[in-house]
Amino acid sequence: MARYTQRPENALKRANEFIEVGKPLRALDTLQEVFRNKRWNYAYSETVIEPLMFKYLYLCVELKKSHIAKEGLFQYRNMFQLVNVNSLENVIRGYLKMAEEHTEAAQAQSSAAVAVLELDDLDNIATPESILMSAVCGEDAQDRSDRTILLPWVKFLWESYCQCLELLRVNTHCEALYHDIARMAFQFCLKYNRKSEFRRLCDKLRKHLEDICKSSNQTTGVSINKVETQQLCLDTRLYLLDSAIQMELWQEAYKAIEDIHGLMALSKKTPVPKTMANYYQKLAMVFSKAGNQLFHAAALLKLFQLTRELKKNLTKDDLQRMAAHVLLATLSIPLPSAHPEFDRFIEADKSPLEKAQKLAVLLGLPQPPTRVSLIREVVRLNVPQLVSEDFRNLYNWLEVDFNPLNLCKRIQSIVDFIENGPENALLTPYIQSLKDVTIMRLIRQISQVYESIKFQRLLQLASFCNIFELEKLLVESVRHNDMQIRIDHQKNSIYFGTDLTESQREYRPDGPALQSMPSEQIRSQLVNMSTVLTRAVSIVYPNRERDQRAKLRNQMVNHYHEIKDREHQRILQRQKIIEDRKEYIEKQNNAREEEEARRQEEESRKAKLAEQKRLEQEQEERERKRHQNEIQAIREKSLKEKVQQISQTAHGKKMLSKLDEEGIKKLDAEQIAKRESEELQREAKELQSKLKSQEKKIDYFERAKRLEEIPLFEKYLAEKQVKDKEFWEATEKTRIENAIAERKDAVAQQERLKRMYPDRDEFLEALKKERASLYVEKLKKFEAALEAERKKRLADRIIRRREERRQAFLREKEEERLRKEEEIRLAQAAEERAAAEARRLEREAEDEKRRAQYEKQRAKEEEAERKIKEDRDRLSRELASERERTEKDRDTWRPRGGDRPSASNGGSSEWRRAAPAASERNDRGGERIERGGERIERGGERLERGGERIERGGDRDRKDNEGADSSWRVRREPDSQRAAAPKDSGAPQSRDDKWRRGGERDRDFRIDGARRDRDDGPRRDRDDGPRRDRDDERGGFRRADGARRTDEPQRETGGNWRDAPRHADRETRRPAERRDRDVRETRGDQRGSAPKEAASGGVGGNWRTAPATREEKPAAKRDQAQEKENKAGDDGEWTSVKRR
């Protein structure tokens, strides 16, 4: 059976009733049932749930149930974090405010309790109890009162802060509230001095920040890449740093500084100068507390630079005070050790160099600072000139002047100035470090002046240290600063630099120095000798070095002239390589970016799926825990009710008194009932035994009492009977007298009323008459009104029923019309679907047919290409063999590139003249290639329209060149023909190249062809788009090498240049008969106007054009004989050539 649940508003009323009767636990259970019931979670708005939530949290605070408050807050967040964030914020702030108020009230109560105890007895302030308690626990009354009264509320408030932070850490809408609660938690730790809770709070916030940086941006997730989030985190860490410094938790302060630096590095926006100044100030304080004087001075120097550069209203006094602070902190840095490698023998997690590098990163420095570098930076910034005269003298005495006898006296005056000046309170911590640096300077300067010195004399010079401190500094200087010092306690003397053979490293003095140590002089003797000898050689031979430099310069110039062209080409080539490399890298970057984008998208998808799975698992886990908690709560409730029920009985109280709280919690209701029954049985047995033991006593005692009572009872009854008789007689007499008096009064009253009978009868008659007429009149009016209302209602019912019948008829007509329209629409939709399906099947059949035709044509094309390649290879081999035979005969009458023979030496025919120059052939070949490319483009367009022709215009250049080099061009004419040619013929003596490509006739023919091509352009592009799209959708193949499909079958031709393929886009051109007729007419016109070439023995027409028709006359016999001889000499080369 399902559990009965109340509506939220009813639950709130019920909870208020429980509170009024003093049952807050029942009220809290009632409200908790509402939040546990998912039926009401999302059915009501925040206006209904928010008052209930406030009451729920109020009860949790009153009863100190922080875990129950956490459960309710999480449920409320899930309901309203995406709907109304302000409501969630108000609820959380109200909860924390109530917890803080109760904690403050507990603190005031604790203080008041201690005050009452203290003022209880002024004569006995120290009571024996207080003395014993202080001896046992070591606490005073305030501590004990706080532990009993204040500490539970402090713990509750701390748990409340932690729960709210955990609640809001992943909600981007509540970022400001999250950081406000973090600051409130810091204030809580400061107010109640909770250092351990402060450390846990810092760890919790650091863990939350790491989770934000790792997690992806969800729907309500917090993204660290947003500027607002970064600024809020930065402000919170700065507040954390201030709180840690106030509580003197320097380790937490250092971790906060690391977090702040990481956030500033992560932010794309530069932090404001005020934030940076606060950061450097706190960092310098942390370094000072850690005893790291070097980085403390570096942080102060960064703060001084930032303030000097960015603060506009900086006064001279402030600048002087900051400069003095920086200068004194820098001078107080201990002198660096000459043995930094000693630290690597110390077992630690990180080496000192790594630690120093990490600290330098916090200051924004590229490398760790040193004392020398900081002093150099201080001098560069002109800090010594900004301070007062005393501090300027301090710098000069420590870092510039060499005066060991007066050094300590001078420094002592500065120390006195710092200690006596109230404005120098910030500089007091540097006094001891300054004294140590001064003593070390003194020892170093004394070692450069004296070889030995008395201990007492050195103590006089070091005025502000005793003998033990001085000896310790001497030992430390030997250990860390690589100084040769020997103390002779017998003679009470100190010896410096006695071992002249020991000097492990180069000595670089830090600060003022008079001379180097003797061991250093001996170690660098060879270096000094080399320097002196080099200087002497330059003085003895002053021109040698100049001549060497001039010779070296000439060699460099000559070498430059030798390699400049090569280097120039190399640089240009390198530039080209760089450009290619850039293009390659750009392509790689683009590909990588695309791959990265795909990978990120995939990772984002996987992360979303994982997050969704995690949320589902968490939801299941929460449901499981909630179910377990409900079962446990039911058990506890039943146990509590059972215990309460048992405690109401005497034997139950007795049984419970034998058990403690832990024992009761371990038992369940059945075990308690069992113990109760056992207790009842035991008590019953005890009672039965007692009764049996007392039965005899009671029996005899009762019998004795009754025997003694008999005479007394008889006397009492006799006296009582006499008294009762007297009382009855007196009472009866009084009753009779009263009855007689009442009778007399009633008779007198009746006599007085008899005279009013006639008046009564008259009044009744008049009243009856008057009311009868009024009744009749009202009855008539009522019947008339009733009849009128009946008629009106009948008329209204007739009209209403008539209107209802009309509306029903219209509704039926409308439904019939809609039904018919729906049937027509469904029929039309079915017809359209059938037509679409038919069109789709038709398109698929057409595509399949075209695909099969394409595959068939493609096989034909591959076969034709293979045959063309074989013919080309065969012809190239034949041409090569023919070329070898002709080179043996050495055609002397027609040398290539030389002077052409005159007409008198040989009147060869027009087609036997030498081939054009290579450049002319190449030009014409290039022209063919260009026109071939145009044909390829047009052919590609026809292929997209579904054509199946293939145009190989790209091969025209190769075939033309092969034809130009073929054997017929270099064969000799027979001597008989040369002799038979008349020398006085009308043929021109110079060469006529009109038959060649590019002549006048061919030019007209090409112009006409080009004009036709231009006319065909628009017709080719007229219907190209849709078919191209359809072919692209079908995945139509398009060749990229220039060849394309044609509608005509492939001709098997030879490898000669005359076999170049023709244009395949003829479907849009003029018919072939009309084009041939135009060409013949053009030729006829040209023959009529051209000079007669037949007399010279040449061919009359241009052989490159279309062949002669049937109507033309046969060629002359001499031409036929010449043709036979050429064919015989070509070795069958022209037999396979088909006429166009």
Curated annotation (Swiss-Prot):
The PCI domain covers which part of the protein? 319-501
Keyword vocabulary terms for this entry:
Cytoplasm, Initiation factor, Phosphoprotein, Protein biosynthesis, RNA-binding
Gene Ontology annotations for the cellular component aspect, listed alphabetically? cytosol; eukaryotic 43S preinitiation complex; eukaryotic 48S preinitiation complex; eukaryotic translation initiation factor 3 complex; eukaryotic translation initiation factor 3 complex, eIF3e; eukaryotic translation initiation factor 3 complex, eIF3m; multi-eIF complex
* Phosphoserine PTM sites in chain numbering: S908
**UniProt feature coiled coil, ranges:** none
According to the record, the residues making up region (Disordered) are 588-630, 829-1140
The residue ranges flagged as biased composition, category Basic and acidic residues, are 588-623, 829-899, 920-976, 990-1051, 1059-1086, 1109-1130
A Pfam family the protein falls into? PCI
Q: Does the keyword Phosphoprotein apply?
A: yes
Q: Name one GO molecular function term.
A: mRNA binding
Q: Give its localization.
A: Cytoplasm
Q: Name one GO biological process term.
A: regulation of translational initiation
* Record note on quaternary structure: Component of the eukaryotic translation initiation factor 3 (eIF-3) complex. The eIF-3 complex interacts with pix.
What the record says about family reads:
Belongs to the eIF-3 subunit A family.
Record-linked PANTHER family: EUKARYOTIC TRANSLATION INITIATION FACTOR 3 SUBUNIT A (PTHR14005:SF0), EUKARYOTIC TRANSLATION INITIATION FACTOR 3, THETA SUBUNIT (PTHR14005)
Primary role: RNA-binding component of the eukaryotic translation initiation factor 3 (eIF-3) complex, which is involved in protein synthesis of a specialized repertoire of mRNAs and, together with other initiation factors, stimulates binding of mRNA and methionyl-tRNAi to the 40S ribosome. The eIF-3 complex specifically targets and initiates translation of a subset of mRNAs involved in cell proliferation.
Protein name stated in the entry: Eukaryotic translation initiation factor 3 subunit A
Species of origin: Drosophila melanogaster (Fruit fly)
